[in-house]
Design a protein with these regions (language model features):
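Short amphipathic alpha-helical interaction segments
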Residues: 324-338
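Short, Lys/Arg-rich nucleic-acid/phosphate-binding segment
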Residues: 230, 347-352
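Hydrophobic residues in beta-strands and at strand termini
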Residues: 89, 355-356
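Short pre-active-site segment immediately N-terminal to redox-active cysteine/selenocysteine motifs
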Residues: 2-3, 11
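Short, amphipathic alpha-helical interaction segments positioned at domain boundaries
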Residues: 358-372
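Extended hydrophobic-aromatic, low-complexity segments
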Residues: 315-316, 328, 346
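A short, conserved structural fragment
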Residues: 339-348
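C-terminal scaffold of the Radical SAM
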Residues: 8-42, 46-324
Length: 372
């Protein structure tokens, strides 16, 4: 397996870390649990609502690894009833029996990275699966016992037409997942696409894809609740909702990120060393980096997350999640957004915030108003 040319996430080729043809599962599990022990004070007295197992293709680890990991997590953490526990999966490495064990271990939601069903686009994206494997991955997930599945699908791909984008989306809808993450390709720094930019669709085509695609999703019962997220029967991604509502989370593992709010109002982010070898070797100077969120940056940090969600929220949520009074700068920015038609006037009169349809379309311009 190799890294995809558009991916800026913390993924590394597995063959670089294999010993005698095997991943260093025992060593990695031991380091994960030591990492968790160090972060336990941050979650003391809290119920864990969700977990997300991501980073490349975590399903490459064995069934035994996940039985041991989940047993340890249940022992060390206090879990809410019906907690959502998601694993990312790659259609090109899908084994039904293995995923049946993952389900028995306690993982109850899958996020399958399909991205496209079309051979030419899959090749451009560096994906190792094909159309049939993508379809079979969903079928095998159901057979393994998963009743909560997300499909990741991309649009705005190199040389992609409106018809091609809708063909991909239509097939994804036919597979009837509970959740569809349908997001536009963005060229990120430190990726192959950034170094050698492909030819992307023109803006008019991108707008057409977005409009027609969202209409198709709505027609088939998928409600858009976030910029790129759509769910059926309110099966929204609880883990991501916590991110976007500015909730707290800990991150364990190589490259994992966390956000913690202390009772004194201090808010900081953590990130663990990205490279698995450094992580396994427990190098103290790179294992954990803590970065405080400065008070003047809080309005942007908060709104940058909350405004991704297409839901109304109370202005007092700012105080509840930041332990700070609503600053005048935030009020002023909201008033400017109201004048520009980016926020809803009726909700604002009730001290609530909601983006208008124009605000959804021009989200970047809306967020710029909250820059310090």
């Amino acid at each position: 397996m190799r890294k995809c040319p558009y991916c800026d996430f913390n993924s590394h080729q597995a063959d670089r870390f294999e010993s005698n043809g095997k991943l260093p599962e025992d060593a990695y599990l031991a380091q994960l649990l030591a990492d968790l022990d160090a972060d336990l004070p941050y979650v003391a007295g809290r119920k864990i609502q969700t977990a997300f197992i991501g980073g490349g293709t975590p399903s490459l680890m064995s069934e035994d690894f996940y039985y041991r990991l989940m047993d340890a997590l249940r022992e060390k953490l206090s879990w809410a009833d019906n907690a959502e526990i998601t694993m990312e999966a790659n259609p090109g490495t899908f084994e039904q029996e293995k995923f049946r064990h993952f389900r028995q271990a306690g993982i109850n939601r899958l996020s399958i990275g399909i991205q496209s069903f079309q051979p030419n686009l899959l090749k451009t994206l560096g994906r190792i699966h094909n159309r049939e494997e993508a379809i079979h991955a969903v079928d095998k997930s159901r057979a393994a016992g998963f009743d909560n599945i997300n499909l990741d699908l991309m649009h705005g791909l190199p040389d992609q037409s409106l018809d091609m984008a809708l063909e991909d989306l239509s097939l994804a809808i036919e597979l009837n997942p509970e959740h569809l993450s349908w997001y536009q390709l963005t060229i990120e720094p430190n990726t192959e696409f950034y170094r050698r930019p492909p030819t992307l669709p023109e803006d008019n085509t991108l707008w057409g894809i977005q409009d027609a695609g969202q209409a198709l999703l709505t027609q088939h019962g998928y409600a858009q609740y976030e910029v790129s997220a759509n769910s059926k029967d309110n099966r929204r991604a609880a883990h991501n909702l916590n991110y976007w509502r500015f909730g707290d989370y800990i991150g364990i593992g190589a490259g994992a990120h966390g956000k913690i709010t202390l009772v004194n109002g201090e808010i900081f982010r953590t990130r663990k060393t990205r490279h698995p070898n450094h992580y396994l070797n427990n190098l103290p100077e790179v294992l954990v980096i803590k970065e405080a969120i400065e008070q003047e940056d809080l309005p942007l940090e908060f709104m940058m997350n909350r405004l991704r969600l297409f839901e109304t929220f109370d202005l007092k949520d700012y105080e509840r999640f930041t332990y700070q009074s609503v600053p005048f700068s935030l009020i002023k920015a909201c008033e400017t957004a109201l004048k520009q038609g980016l926020l809803d006037h009726d909700e604002w009169t009730q001290q609530r915030v909601k983006t208008t349809e124009k605000g959804k379309l021009f989200l970047n311009e809306l967020l710029e108003l909250f820059l310090p």
